[in-house]
Regions:
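ABC ATPase nucleotide-binding domains
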Residues: 229-260
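Catalytic Walker B motif of ABC-type/P-loop ATPase nucleotide-binding domains
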Residues: 159-163
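Conserved ABC ATPase "signature" region
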Residues: 97, 112-130
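The feature captures the beta-strand-to-loop junction immediately N-terminal to the Walker
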Residues: 33-35
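Conserved ABC transporter NBD signature motif
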Residues: 56-64, 73
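Conserved ABC ATPase signature
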Residues: 109, 134-138, 142
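Helix-to-loop junction immediately C-terminal to a conserved catalytic motif
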Residues: 48
C-alpha cells in the first residue's frame, strides 16, 4: 500500500535521513517511534512531499508517490500534521468540509453524501457542539481533533499522522487511536507515547539519528534493552491483566549532582 525505499534527505549543512526504508500493508497500523530529533517528522514530510528526498523512492498503491499530482495524492492519502494555525476565520464545520475538496471539481458543490459524511465524522470526533464555532478560538486539543476529522472526511485509503495525539487529553487520545484502528485504513503515524504505540500499532519502526535502528512487532521492538539504547532510560516491559503490552519507566536519579 505505502512504502519507502532508501529515502535520504538533508540540508546544505547536514544529512538528516539516511536510506530509510519502510512498508505499510493495506489495513495495517504502522508506528514510527524514536526520541526527539530522530527524523520522524522529516521522514513523513518526505512522504507527503513537503520536502523532496535527495535519494530514494516512495510508492502509494503501487504507483510512484513522488510523481503524483497533488490532487492524485490527496485522493489516496490524507495527512494530519503537528502545526495547526490558520490565518482565516473558518468555522469548525467549514474546516472539516475542506477534506472533500480533493473529490470535487472546481465549482462543484457538496451533495447529500458529502454532508452526511461530514455529519458522521463530526459525531465520531465529538465536535458536533462546536461545529459553528470559529476554528481560531479552539484549544490546541480541539484544533487537533478538527484536523483529524478533516482527514477522515477526505475518505482516503491511507492516513499519515504526525504526532496525532499531541495536545489531546488521555480520553481523546484513546478514542482517536481506537477510531483510526477500527476504520481499517492503512495508517503510518509518528507517535511519542510508547504505550499507545504498543497498544494500537501492528508494526513499529524505531528511528535514531536519522536511521532505522530497529523494526518489528511491538513485542519484538519494545524491549528493556532497546529502550535503554534508544531512549537512554531504564524500563520494565510486561503484560497487564488483559494481555496488553505495557512499559513502566524507572525514575532518573541524578546522583551526585548539587541541589538547585
Amino acid at each position: 500500500m505505502l512504502s519507502a525505499e532508501g529515502i535520504s534527505y538533508g540540508t546544505r549543512d547536514r544529512e538528516i535521513l539516511y536510506e530509510i526504508s519502510l512498508r505499510a500493508e493495506a489495513g495495517e497500523f504502522v508506528g514510527i517511534i524514536g526520541p526527539n530529533g530522530s527524523g520522524k517528522s522529516t521522514l513523513l514530510k518526505n512522504l507527503y512531499k513537503v520536502l523532496r528526498p535527495r535519494a530514494g523512492r516512495a510508492f502509494l498503491m503501487g504507483e510512484d508517490l513522488l510523481a503524483m499530482s497533488g490532487r492524485e495524492m490527496a485522493q489516496r492519502l490524507a495527512v494530519v500534521v503537528q502545526e495547526h494555525e490558520s490565518g482565516f476565520d473558518f468555522t469548525v464545520e467549514e474546516v472539516v468540509r475542506m477534506g472533500r475538496h480533493a473529490r470535487k471539481g472546481l465549482l462543484e458543490a457538496d451533495n447529500g453524501q458529502d454532508r452526511s459524511l461530514v455529519d458522521r465524522v463530526l459525531r465520531l470526533t465529538q465536535l458536533e457542539e462546536v461545529r459553528e464555532q470559529s476554528y481560531t478560538t479552539l484549544s490546541g486539543g480541539e484544533k487537533q481533533r478538527v484536523l483529524i476529522a478533516r482527514a477522515l472526511v477526505q475518505d482516503t485509503p491511507c492516513l499519515l499522522l504526525d504526532a496525532p495525539t499531541n495536545h489531546l487529553d488521555i480520553k481523546y487520545q484513546l478514542q482517536l487511536m481506537e477510531l483510526v484502528r477500527v476504520l481499517g485504513r492503512t495508517v503510518v503515524a509518528a507517535i511519542h507515547d510508547l504505550n499507545l504505540a504498543a497498544l494500537y500499532c501492528q508494526r513499529l519502526y524505531v528511528m535514531k539519528a536519522g536511521r532505522v535502528a530497529a523494526s518489528g512487532t511491538p513485542e519484538e521492538v519494545l524491549t528493556p534493552e532497546l529502550l535503554r539504547e534508544i531512549y537512554e532510560v531504564e524500563a520494565e516491559v510486561a503484560r497487564d491483566s488483559r494481555g496488553c503490552l505495557r512499559i513502566f519507566f524507572q525514575p532518573i536519579r541524578n546522583e551526585g549532582e548539587e541541589s538547585i
